[in-house]
């Protein structure tokens, strides 16, 4: 009896760390529960706002150990949509995204900082227009739990800003328009 109890306790103690381990999620783009939107100052007067309609990715997350989080995203840059066909054609061209040569942009996390209360800084490498540079995303864990269809979901928001010139974007729109602001909404479905 003591041997059985000891064996059971050892078995439970070996399984306990696995229960607290990170879960893998796929970003839910099919259900339109994720978005990548951008904003660029337009000549100091207003903003051009747009989005990327085609992207995919995954992440690994454990709320008990958020610093172990990993994120990988691929964006089809041809899917840029600023709600203006002629402008989108220009954005896809050599002055901006050069999609004829670089049809994909990627982000791969390298580390995560836990700032408390669900706030994170996700550090990683953004590859855009054939150039790879470090990028930090200020993120917030919105929540996680069971969905009505028997799955499990986790959601995050994020923001970041980068200088267009850092990624070899040739078009100079002036100092007021030199940076791109990204707003991210991510909902993942546990695999």
Swiss-Prot record:
Its main location: periplasm. It holds the Pfam family YceI. Keywords: Periplasm, Signal. Residues 1-22 form the signal peptide. SUPFAM superfamilies: YceI-like. It is found in: Periplasm. Transmembrane segments: none annotated. This is UPF0312 protein Sputcn32_2702. It comes from Shewanella putrefaciens (strain CN-32 / ATCC BAA-453).
